[in-house]
From Swiss-Prot:
The protein's name in its UniProt record: Nuclear protein MDM1
Major location (coarse): nucleus
Recorded coiled-coil stretches: 339-364
InterPro entries per record: MDM1
Motif (ST]-E-Y-X(3)-F motif 3): 235-241
Length: 719
């Protein structure tokens, strides 16, 4: 017989079965509801508890104790001979006779037998089963020895009345023998691990009549045991879910033609046919309308508005506008079309992909960017902008050359272009990295080439006497033009200051560049010890379009207040320069140019001091040879050569080796710049004063630098 566990498991206590619609309408019979009513535990299939290691093993026999070890207590010997009469237990009447027989049977044994150690029983349903089985087995012995017990009772009449209260253990023992339900002892020490985890399913307290009927059925062997239908043959799954329809057999056309009224009915419709007939018959009998009892079917429910459907609607209810999908409550006529739904998004994605492709290829230029590169004024940013076309450039752009040798404009007018071309070729053949300049003091805002020692004094005095009238004539011509007023005055001032302060404060710095153009090779840069920047790592020697510009030096409010007007500043500078030029001695020994640090107004890199000194010392003999060859009686002095030093231009130019996207045009590159910290506040003041005098040119310069700075910041896009 299979073991069927009828107790409440932990799963059944925590997870209750959710009643379906069918189970609520299903009304089982009483026998099906209480299938275990009136059955003993052994009949339920529970014979014993599972054997656990933690459960103490107890023998199944009563231990034999000798009489001299028995404990008599306060009972006298004569009382032990006369057994007490059984107490009438308050139980139903059908049980009185049976309990009297059990009590008479107990009188044969002495009263102390109840104090004999009993076998240890577990307090689960199997203990009740054992008690019930013991009662059934002893029932035969009681019927056989009934006459003998009565004779013994007659021979030994009871002389002592029954005590008012019976010991609870004895009462529990009698209840067990009678087959009644006994409340288990709540002793935690005797509970097993299994009992502590799982609570047995206990029935409700039954009425006295039910208890008597239970005892009567358990004791009598004539009446068969009532066993109802312990399990339901039809499962709930079969009741709720119907199987697939059987496979239809092939039918002939003739059969279908003969039975034209043949209708294929599903099993659900066939099951509903008797219900329809009953409803029709009932409606004919009574005029009152009767509602048809709709049986429960396993059918698909209606459309439920779930949370997912409320949040995620169909794409037809959205419209793409301004880079985002927005929900449109009103139904539009053209909303469901492909153009309205997807065309805008696809177009935007393709434009983004094209911009990303151009960014990777380096061709993402706007119209303004391209116009600036291809414009005519682009040559102003060139390093080697001293060309025949430079004379046609407007003077306001010429003023951007803040630190250059501005005598080139005068030499263009004095000498024919053929001689100028020869000089430029001669300069290009010389190592350009040996040129030296200096911007040390604020009184000398421009750069002048260092003169030789033997004609330093004479040559300079001649230059002063010859250049001043020519400079005045150039200034008078420039005043006639509206666009060249500020630039012409600035050229005179810078020229005179270069003549006065050139020998003593002339600069020497080295700009190392490659002769052919482009960036120097990496081994050469490593030998020079030049610190590389992120542009050197990414920008190739040919091509590329990375445009950067240095940070703009903004003058403070006090400096702006102290700035004189353009006319006053020019007059004061002229007077001061002429005085200094007359009284200052010119000698090479007192000149601080040899081995001095130079000042770069816009430094971009950091160079070591040792590199600057080493290159400056190496350039001295080269300069001597260069000046000796070019300084002939028929030619002007080297200070008037139409050459503008590369480092004197505005940094951040388009044709700089940092931005080599204008290929095929002659240029001079500057790869070695000055050490960090050489740029001071005095240089910023000088730049601000010059830009204030040339308002038009400075405005254009700052606008160009601002555009370059903006392109630099927006090159990779803002995060």
């Amino acid at each position: 017989m299979p073991v069927r566990f009828k107790g409440l498991s932990e799963y059944q206590r925590n997870f209750l079965w959710k009643k379906s619609y069918l189970s609520e309408s299903y009304n089982p019979s009483v026998g099906q509801k209480y299938t275990w009513a009136g059955l003993r535990s052994d009949q339920l299939g529970i014979t014993k508890e599972p054997s656990f290691i933690s459960k103490r093993r107890v023998p199944y026999y009563d231990p034999q104790i000798s009489k001299y070890l028995e404990w008599n207590g306060t009972v006298r010997e004569n009382d032990a001979l006369a057994p007490p009469e059984p107490q009438i237990i308050r139980t139903p009447k059908p049980q009185e006779a049976e309990q009297r027989e059990d009590a008479n049977h107990e009188t044969v044994l002495p009263q102390e037998a109840s104090r004999v150690p009993k076998r240890t029983r577990s307090h689960s349903a199997d203990s009740r089963a054992e008690g019930a089985s013991d009662g059934v087995e002893k029932h035969q012995d009681v019927t056989k020895n009934h006459s003998l017990v009565n004779a013994d009772v007659e021979l030994r009449p009871s002389t002592k009345p029954l005590p008012e209260s019976i010991e609870p253990r004895l009462d529990r023992h009698l209840r067990k023998k009678a087959g009644l339900a006994v409340v288990p002892l709540n002793n935690a020490l005797r509970n097993s691990e299994y009992q502590r985890q799982f609570v047995w399913k206990t029935c409700k307290e039954t009425a006295p009549v039910c208890a008597a009927n239970q005892v009567f059925r358990n004791k009598s062997q004539v009446i068969p045991q009532f066993q109802g239908n312990t399990f339901i043959h039809e499962s709930e799954y079969k009741r709720n879910f119907k199987g697939l329809t059987p496979v239809k057999e092939p039918k002939l056309r003739e059969y279908l033609k003969g039975n034209s009224s043949f209708e294929i009915l599903s099993p659900e419709k066939k099951a509903d046919e008797p219900l329809d007939l009953e409803v029709d018959m009932a409606s004919e009998d009574s005029d009152q309308p009767i509602k048809k009892p709709a049986p429960w079917r396993h059918q698909r429910l209606g459309k439920v508005n779930s949370e997912y459907r409320a949040k995620f609607l169909s794409p037809a209810q959205y419209l793409y506008k301004a880079g985002a999908w927005t929900r449109v409550k009103e139904s539009l006529s053209h909303q469901g079309s492909l153009n309205a739904m997807w065309y805008a998004e696809v177009k935007e994605l393709r434009e983004k992909a094209e911009s990303y492709r151009k960014r990777v290829q380096g061709t993402h230029f706007s119209r303004d960017h391209l116009n600036q590169i291809m414009s005519d004024s682009n040559c102003c940013w060139d390093v080697s902008s001293v060309a025949s076309s430079e004379g046609t450039i407007s003077s306001n752009i010429q003023a951007l050359d803040l630190a250059g040798d501005l005598t080139s404009h005068r030499t263009l007018q004095k000498h024919p272009p053929t001689k100028l071309e020869e000089k430029k070729v001669a300069l290009a053949e010389q190592p350009l990295e040996n040129t030296i300049r200096s911007l040390e003091l604020p009184e000398a805002p421009t750069m002048a080439r260092r003169k030789l020692a033997w004609d330093a004094a004479e040559g300079t005095q001649k230059e002063d006497t010859q250049e001043e009238p020519s400079g005045e004539e150039d200034g008078r011509e420039a005043r006639g033009k509206d666009k060249q007023v500020c630039a012409g005055e600035l050229q005179k001032v810078d020229m005179q200051t270069s003549k006065a302060d050139g020998p003593t404060e002339g600069s020497e710095t080295s700009s190392v560049s490659s002769g052919k153009g482009g960036r120097l090779p990496t081994p050469r840069l490593r030998e020079l010890g030049i610190q590389r920047t992120h542009h050197d790592l990414t920008t190739p020697a040919v091509g590329g379009a990375v445009l950067v510009s240095p940070a703009k030096a903004k003058p403070s409010a006090l400096e702006q207040r102290r700035r004189p007007s353009s006319q006053d500043g020019l007059e004061t500078l002229k007077k001061g320069i002429t005085k200094k030029g007359k009284h200052r001695p010119l000698s090479l020994l007192t000149s601080p140019t040899a081995g001095m640090k130079t000042v770069d107004p816009l430094p971009l890199r950091q160079d070591c001091d040792a590199n600057v000194l080493r290159v400056a010392e190496g350039t001295l003999p080269v300069l001597k040879n260069l000046d000796h060859q070019t300084n002939t009686p028929g030619q002007p002095s080297p200070c008037t050569l139409p050459y503008c030093h590369p480092s004197s231009r505005i940094q951040g130019r388009l044709r700089d080796p940092e931005f080599q996207h204008n290929i095929g045009k002659p240029r001079m590159n500057n790869t070695q710049l000055l050490p960090h910290g050489a740029f001071n506040d005095e240089d910023a003041d000088r730049l601000s004063e010059i830009s204030a005098r040339s308002a038009v040119s400075s405005l254009q310069a700052f606008q160009t630098l601002a555009r370059a700075q903006k392109r630099k910041e927006n090159f990779w896009g803002k995060p």
